[in-house]
Amino acid sequence: MNRKSIKKITALFLILALSVCSGAITGEATADSLVLTDDDGDRIINYKFNYKGATVYALIVLDPSRVYVGTALPEPADWGYGITLDAMAQQYGAVAGINAGGFLDQNGAGNGWPPSGITYGRGINFSTMENGPIAGLDRSNKMWAGYLSYNDCENVGIRDAVSFGPALVVDGVKTDRSLFESGIGARTAIGQREDGAIVMMVVDGRQGYSIGVTYADCADIMVDKFGCINASNMDGGNSSCMYYAGQLVNRSSNQASGTRNLPDAWLVSPLPEGYVKAESVPDQIVISGNALGEIKEYEHACDQETSERMFKFVCEFLQAYYGYFGTKNSDYYYPTMLEYVAPESELKNLMDLALMDRLWVNTWKTTANNIELNGVYSNGDGSYDVIITSDVYEQSNYWNYEAPDTTLRVTLIEAPERSRGYLVTATY
């Protein structure tokens, strides 16, 4: 099989319990923890507090797939100019962001370009550097922090990354502080919580109202305040800046020169198309004659037409593979409603792939009974990785064309009496 010709599409379906998804998102500090709610529904927490005499700004992005690296130039180039964070955010149509990696200050000109070290922006490699300390997100939206080579990045599937450091937290453990002693100053850091949410943090420094923090302080905040399991320091000083809700949030440590031109930034895309708040939703959704369960209350939902299309895809797929949504089983496992869906064009492509015709669905149904031999693997936690490879199809007499390699992760939670829940689809 020619792996270069394989197209991989990944979708994640997750039903979340009421206790996870209630409330609005704002931040209030206690001595040891944060109380979070969501008032505006943008799924981003905008949070500000004081830490040891320093002003700390934080954005918590609940969906890590929305976070990516934007660059001042769209393609790799040896020479050019960086741009300010607000200009970069507007260039990409981003709703939020922070500065990211450093740049090679050629001749001391302060041009903000090219980026230093390994840099990936939406899958494009902007640097020929072989290795270095990085902060990156792979295609499964997991954050990596620490030293990675270019080959490492390719092997683990890094989609977005910048080269800077030091790593502050790796796999839940704060890095040895003796390895990154620092003075007090303006700082930028990025981290990821265990639930996948991305934490972006900027600390003002070298100013009368905010003296700044050390690297060790950043690690403490990331772990003790935000619960990050991986985190990395980003470029600080005059580069430290945050953008949210159409404006710069913090103050540059160099008020005279203003914000610095940057080579890249961690940006946040808008909510996916189709995400809307719903005042009311139908009491039931019936697909193929099977009621998926009574729905009493929602906080967020997409429109009914899109919901029904996505439910049809989910039900057809699961019925073909497992029979979960047959007449006998529909009372035990059911999704309730979509929190958001992928853009309409992507949703249609995903459905077309899964439901190309009845022959494909029937073939899935007959070949997937033996899940170990036909690419359906239980992860042991209620989720399944469904992998259909070109090899499988090429061995079948039914196919006279090459089929794509598809990976689908499905997570089901048994909760027949739940009155509120979510079915979340991740972009792919």
Regions found by a protein language model. Give the residues of each.
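Hydrophobic core
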Residues: 14-22
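Zymogen propeptides
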Residues: 27-127
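N-terminal low-complexity, Pro/Thr/Ser-rich intrinsically disordered segments
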Residues: 30-48, 276-309
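Conserved, well-ordered active-site substructure
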Residues: 107-129, 178-233, 239-281, 285
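Core segments of small alpha/beta cavity-forming domains
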Residues: 287-364
